[in-house]
Amino acid sequence: MVDVNRFKSMQITLASPSKVRSWSYGEVKKPETINYRTLKPEREGLFDEVIFGPTKDWECACGKYKRIRYRGIVCDRCGVEVTRTKVRRERMGHIELKAPVSHIWYFKGIPSRMGLTLDMSPRALEEVIYFAAYVVIDPKDTPLEHKSIMTEREYRERLREYGYGSFVAKMGAEAIQDLLKQVDLEKEIAELKEELKTATGQKRVKAIRRLDVLDAFYKSGNKPEWMILNILPVIPPDLRPMLQLDGGRFASSDLNDLYRRVINRNNRLARLLELNAPGIIVQNEKRMLQEAVDALIDNGRRGRPITGPGSRPLKSLSHMLKGKQGRFRQNLLGKRVDFSGRSVIAVGPTLKMYQCGVPREMAIELFKPFVMREIVARDIVQNVKAAKRLVERGDERIWDILEEVIKEHPVLLNRAPTLHRLGIQAFEPVLIDGKALRLHPLVCEAYNADFDGDQMAIHVPLSEEAQAEARILMLAAEHILNPKDGKPVVTPSQDMVLGNYYLTMEEAGREGEGMVFKDRDEAVMAYRNGYVHLHSRVGIATDSLNKPWTEEQRHKVLLTTVGKILFNDIMPEGLPYLQEPNNANLTEGVPAKYFLPLGGDIKEAISNLELNPPFKKKNLGNIIAEIFKRFRTTETSALLDRMKNLGYHHSTLAGLTVGIADIPVVDDKTEIIEESHKRVEQITKQFRRGMITDDERYNAVTAEWRAAREKLEKRLIANQDPKNPIVMMMDSGARGNISNFSQLAGMRGLMAAPNGRIMELPILSNFREGLSVLEMFFSTHGARKGMTDTALKTADSGYLTRRLVDVAQDVIIREDDCGTDRGLLIRSIAEGKEMIESLEERLNGRYTKKTVKHPETGAVIIGPNELITEDKAREIVNAGVEEVTIRSVFTCNTRHGVCRHCYGINLATGDAVEVGEAVGTIAAQSIGEPGTQLTMRTFHTGGVASNTDITQGLPRVQEIFEARNPKGEAVITEVKGQVTAIEEDASTRTKKVFVKGETGEGEYVVPFTARMRVEVGGQVARGAALTEGSIQPKRLLAVRDVLSVETYLLGEVQKVYRSQGVEIGDKHIEVMVRQMIRKVRVMDPGDTDLLMGTLMDINDFTDANKDVLIAGGVPATGRPVLMGITKASLETNSFLSAASFQETTRVLTDAAIRGKKDHLLGLKENVIIGKIIPAGTGMARYRNLEPYAVNEEEYLNPPVEEEGNEETTEVVVDTAVETVEETVE
């Protein structure tokens, strides 16, 4: 076998007959498989041991030679080579076909490659191949046309007319083979190039397509006649096995049936030819052979598929590759692995952030080899076999050994569906009793796990390297930030939030108010003994608290609560004391009003202070983000554990529960509803009198009920008691929101019908009062729609993620700096008055392209090519700068990836991105993972305002990434200038917009009902929208440059996600959009050897032009092409990646004709062939490092180098560091 890690590339071509013979170990002549009595393979049959190798290791068929010592000997009795039985997976056979047969991929595919090569229509080809017509091979001196088609009857007439032997015409694949042999590629290509200079319309399109195919044959060295098969390869028997079932029956792969059919028909044809049978019988047999081979290669592609028992279509070779169950997606891209298990998860509140609980019986099975090795090493038993017995018996001694083996050995936990990389994280196992895996409560958010019966899978990394990677890169304590937006993903939730909320509440007049304590311990003791309440405001000496006080704050009394003292206890030392839940307190420290000189009047000071709100979920998130910024991961994960324990402890002490008495009653609910009823009656009256349309009536009624519900909601909020448990749960962000609250205490309101339309009759009751039967029915109506939507959305979102991953999987950080001279000018994204994404958010974590100066003073804020930190971004915005030119993925020059400077920081770590990071996959996951949170609906703008629906949510994201024509498309102008007039034409129900500019005038027809974005006298830029709606990106590309289109798409995606409250970093969308626009269509080849109309990678296009320009020739011109992600995935340079994505047969057909080479640059193609992926530690620059032991003393104090040997490169691999440093002395 070839060593996969030694491959540079992989090529696919058409197989020539001689190639097929060179693969084969013998001809399969009989259709038999195995003998039903002996169960041994038949000679010369489909499972023959002589051809394919022995069925038992190191043993020939007759049993003369047994054991490994005879390896390589071919038995003189039975002819079987003594070798491993594994060769039955790799040795091929062949069938010599007695008549040539066409390959269905090349004849039937779209476009038909055979048809284009011969310039014949697919229908004519079909008639010839399946013996329904003759084709003229050589007209000789007759007036017949070369390649003309004639029926049996016409053929006989022509023979009578011109005499026998006066011309040559044949039928079947043999005729096509003769024609293909006659094709002179060079001559045809030259003629087509000439024709292209003058041709137009349909003729030109056809010529371009033919030229493409002929050029592919010419350049790849494939011969066109190889599309016709004279010899058929037989795949190894272990890839089409026969298994004995209990009961003596056999289960066999469908391929065996299909091969049997071919062999039977081939043998029958041979016999008929020997007997010199009548032509019509031979023809019929040849046609049947052709159909049998078609079925073997792609059953069902032409005519009715061949079926097996129960009229099930048989799975042919093509079906073995296609689809989710095919070879690519089922066995090559994802495999089942050993050393894995799965179980239900339960909560493990006592675990540390980096730990998970593994049941003992699971652990002993997973770590069995490690335990056995240790048993032998300790001389408890002598050999592995005995050790295995010991483990299986459950000997007492194994448990201590297991404890030691799992120490420092991380395991991976995964929860399906794995929507982003946080769906697999590493933990240190802790042995527990029971059968459920224990999971830390804080990692639930990343996994989207809960404990209502979810299951998780566990995997054991085996090699030293795998363990090191799991420990350093994948440990759960390291994953504090979410890769999609750089915000903490591990924030306390539910009980933890509630506990900390309760702990930090302030109340006036509770016991112990105004007491002063000398230190923390005294305050806590007073609280424990019941002298002071947790929420009472008290004083404490600042000197006793280990916090960064200023000089004025020292030797003072701080006014706070016992709860806040406990809350601040868990915070790291360098962090200010947290008294108010806001960012100012977090970054700048406690405001002066909370300090009192020693001996001051504390009661008076307290009475002058307002009560502070407690710390909510959002505040806790901000605290965690700030701590991460200052102290990085280790300290943050320790703090999170302390915050979790504190939260659980105090939510238990508080004992907050929900009872029916906690749901308040709104006194004037009846009046509000009465008023609305009256208004609805008035509206109905107006409609009956014909004053308003039905649509207007419907909108007014629904708006009225919405207003009633909002009124009730406002009353509830105004009258809520901050100590009400439901209000506390809601306000803290632990569970529930105002909508839930108003359904419990106000009214349920309007419901959606299954068709998405809102029903006019509202549900007036709330859950406290209870619903009537009719109301209950209405609410199930709406609820059912919610459930179906969710189910459909999940599938849609998953498929979107798959397409995104596919298009971007080869985008990897390849170098430090690409040295580009272009940048992207960015400003905040806004829609009307609404801010979508601020400039500060867009700048954070990016590199500048140009110097940024203060607009007033001219002082330099930040130089070129510098990283913009959070503080710098704030400084830039505060200075009043509105637009900044930054390094962007759009303008990066790196081939097959991005450079570090154009990408900026890795949002998951907050540091500059490392070379080797697979940013394409991260981007795809970041956009796909929140997909399920987006709505499905097409948004109705109230039925009146516009004539089209605006697509939103998930369908809009798909529309953008697939570059489809949007629903409700906006009309755009191609002229830059002034809108001179807008005329309405009542007869055609349209408006005309006139734009006058320096370069010319434009006249645009827009629908009568369209909402205008411009008015007379307004200035418009090129490509600006004249009406409301979405711009079609392909049209925008025709009038503007590539960067404008990329910027537009980026803004549109952000609008959809931000409107749903989902934050995604710009860079992820940039990576995706760049992948959609990396191809060029050649308009004029100039002096290059490119073909007109070819779609090619922009880098290859530039290279071809470079070579021509150096030689002094005319460069080619091309036009950038915007492709949807599905099309872009299929057009990628890697045929392995494209074939494993969609349309497998089409991709492979095309690749084979072109003789495509896959340079294995992406992740998918390397996974498929089993090579380590070229990202992360798999990159060549990291693979070539040899680790060696380092003397610690020398490492810390390196010896002084002598002069003269500066060239040596010393590489130090330090296991505690993620990156590998190359230090050149």
Swiss-Prot record:
Top-level enzyme category: transferase
SMART domains per UniProt: RPOLA_N
Annotated positions binding Zn(2+) 2: 818, 892, 899, 902
InterPro entries, per database record: DNA-dir_RpoC_beta_prime, DNA-dir_RpoC_beta_prime_bact, RNA_pol_asu, RNA_pol_N, RNA_pol_Rpb1_1, RNA_pol_Rpb1_3, RNA_pol_Rpb1_3_sf, RNA_pol_Rpb1_4
EC number: 2.7.7.6
Residues binding Zn(2+) 1: 60, 62, 75, 78
Example of a GO biological process term: DNA-templated transcription
Top-rank taxon: Bacteria
Record-linked NCBIfam families: rpoC_TIGR
Role this protein plays: DNA-dependent RNA polymerase catalyzes the transcription of DNA into RNA using the four ribonucleoside triphosphates as substrates.
Descriptive protein name: DNA-directed RNA polymerase subunit beta'
Organism annotation: Streptococcus pneumoniae (strain P1031)
Lineage: Bacteria, Bacillati, Bacillota, Bacilli, Lactobacillales
